[in-house]
């Protein structure tokens, strides 16, 4: 089947094809995942998976027109810059730097809850993205306003930004409303800031041309589910002492690797699985850090501003530097030496790189080729080391530098 025949089935004229594939900034109509005709997916999906996708496409078929009309009506240079940069609040590096902050300021439990709701929101939204294989709003006609081309290569629904924003906003709502130390004027101010954060992040995904309404609503559902499950688990296990059970860290690591190696295979290349690996690694690293702390009775809780004064604000300088040193300097060499040199894992990374190098000149979105197994385990361990650094090592560094 030729490209002209394919896109004609999608309701695009030959003149439009020539415009959209023009040399000056044009791109292949099938460059982004999820835009192929139904036959492309039917032959590679189970009956239930394909029928689910077909049902949901009724909500995505016309999303590009809606998003394009919204952009035409509301775009301004200021809003472009505002929503482009505030989208970083849902980015990978933002979480790496910002999530540890409450720990260093004395609010350890807040970061713990945030890691759980964000980690499983990322995993579940990524799983459903790869299961449904639904497209983002088409560009063109939509303009994608983004700082990262990486995210444009993911499927659309559910929106991980929407899932994360919903989970975190519900968590803050819950904590603020139940707080015994905050007076109501302060609570109302904080709740207003949470609402502002939520609307900025969620509406920004539509404004930036990255998502349609199905993406946002399904993402919000994922985030709400993860929040309510977390609250239920905290209540159900409130008397559970993890330090008394040797199996707890082993189960956490085994569960994390199990759900990663049993993640659904997307039809087209989609990079969102990498974020799932990273966040599930962080969850397991948190579990192992908590287990060590409770089992051996280590007092690693950082003092708060009331008892330590303004020097608490110097902790992030030491903390962020420690995280960066682990993630960008030490981790890869240490982890892959452990896996390949000592544990004798088969290094299949070069096989995947070779495949991508051979096909990288193709303009059409590639079929999914799989992920290196040793890279899954390696990335899992690298990110498991981040909460270990934050929860176990940073308090020691703060003591050495008289910041604790």
Swiss-Prot record:
| Active-site residues, record numbering mapped to chain | 161 (proton donor), 211 (nucleophile)
| Name of the protein this chain belongs to | Dihydrosphingosine 1-phosphate phosphatase YSR3
The biological process GO terms on file are:
phospholipid dephosphorylation; sphingolipid biosynthetic process
Where this protein primarily resides, as one coarse class?
Answer: endoplasmic reticulum
Family classification: Belongs to the type 2 lipid phosphate phosphatase family.
CDD domains in the cross-refs: PAP2_SPPase1
Q: Which InterPro entries match?
A: P_Acid_Pase_2/haloperoxi_sf (IPR036938), P_Acid_Pase_2/haloperoxidase (IPR000326)
- What are the transmembrane regions? 87-107, 114-134, 155-176, 183-203, 216-236, 242-262, 320-340, 380-400
Gene3D superfamilies per record = Phosphatidic acid phosphatase type 2/haloperoxidase
Source taxon at top rank:
Eukaryota
Disulfide bridge positions per record: none
Q: What does this protein do?
A: Dihydrosphingosine 1-phosphate phosphatase required for efficient ceramide synthesis from exogenous sphingoid bases. Involved in endocytosis and calcium-mediated signaling.
Q: Where is this region: Phosphatase sequence motif I?
A: 129-137
Q: What catalytic reaction does the record list?
A: sphinganine 1-phosphate + H2O = sphinganine + phosphate
Which keywords accompany this UniProt record? Endoplasmic reticulum, Glycoprotein, Hydrolase, Lipid metabolism, Membrane, Sphingolipid metabolism, Transmembrane, Transmembrane helix
Q: Annotated region Phosphatase sequence motif III: where? A: 204-215
Recorded GO cellular component terms are: endoplasmic reticulum; endoplasmic reticulum membrane
Q: What membrane topology term does the record carry?
A: Multi-pass membrane protein
Sites where a glycan is attached: 62
Q: Where is this region: Phosphatase sequence motif II?
A: 158-161
Molecular-function annotations in GO:
dihydrosphingosine-1-phosphate phosphatase activity; sphingosine-1-phosphate phosphatase activity
Q: Does the keyword Glycoprotein belong to this entry?
A: yes
Q: Where is this site: Stabilizes the active site histidine for nucleophilic attack?
A: 215
Q: Which residues lie on this side of the membrane: Cytoplasmic?
A: 108-113, 177-182, 237-241, 341-379
Topological domain ranges for the Lumenal compartment: 1-86, 135-154, 204-215, 263-319, 401-404
Q: Where in the cell is it found?
A: Endoplasmic reticulum membrane
């Amino acid at each position: 089947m030729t490209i002209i025949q394919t896109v004609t089935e999608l309701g695009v004229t030959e003149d439009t094809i020539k415009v959209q594939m023009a040399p000056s900034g044009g791109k292949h109509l099938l460059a982004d995942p999820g835009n192929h005709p139904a036959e492309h997916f039917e032959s590679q999906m189970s009956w239930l998976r394909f029928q689910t996708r077909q049902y949901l496409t009724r909500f995505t078929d016309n999303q590009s027109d809606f998003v394009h009309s919204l952009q035409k009506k509301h775009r301004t240079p200021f809003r472009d810059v505002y929503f482009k940069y505030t989208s970083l609040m849902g980015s990978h590096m933002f979480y790496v730097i910002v999530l540890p902050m409450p720990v260093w300021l004395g609010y350890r439990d807040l970061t713990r809850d945030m890691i759980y709701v964000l980690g499983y929101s990322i995993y579940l939204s990524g799983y459903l993205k790869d299961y449904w294989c639904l497209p983002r709003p088409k560009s063109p006609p939509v303009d994608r306003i983004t700082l990262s081309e990486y995210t444009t290569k993911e499927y659309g629904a559910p929106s991980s930004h929407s899932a994360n924003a919903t989970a975190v906003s519900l968590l803050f709502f819950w904590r603020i409303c139940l707080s015994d130390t905050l007076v109501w004027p302060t609570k109302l101010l904080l709740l207003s800031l949470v609402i502002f954060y939520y609307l900025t992040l969620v509406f920004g995904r539509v404004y930036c041309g990255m998502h349609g309404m199905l993406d946002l609503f399904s993402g919000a559902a994922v985030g709400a589910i993860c929040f309510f499950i977390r609250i239920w688990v905290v209540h159900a296990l409130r008397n559970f002492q993890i330090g008394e059970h040797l199996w707890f860290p082993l189960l956490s690591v085994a569960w994390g690797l199990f759900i990663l190696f049993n993640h659904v295979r997307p039809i087209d290349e989609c990079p969102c699985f990498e974020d799932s690996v990273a966040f599930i690694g962080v969850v397991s690293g948190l579990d192992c850090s908590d287990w060590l702390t409770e089992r051996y009775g280590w007092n690693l809780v950082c003092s708060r501003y009331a008892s330590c004064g303004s020097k608490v604000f110097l902790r992030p300088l030491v903390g962020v530097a420690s995280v960066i040193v682990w993630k960008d300097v030490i981790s890869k060499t240490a982890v892959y030496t452990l896996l390949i040199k000592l544990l004798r894992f088969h290094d299949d990374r070069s096989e995947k790189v070779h495949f991508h190098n051979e096909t990288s000149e193709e303009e059409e979105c590639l079929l999914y080729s799989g992920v290196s197994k040793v890279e899954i385990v390696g990335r899992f361990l690298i990110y498991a080391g981040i909460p270990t650094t934050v929860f176990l090592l940073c308090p020691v560094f703060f003591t050495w530098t008289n910041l604790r």
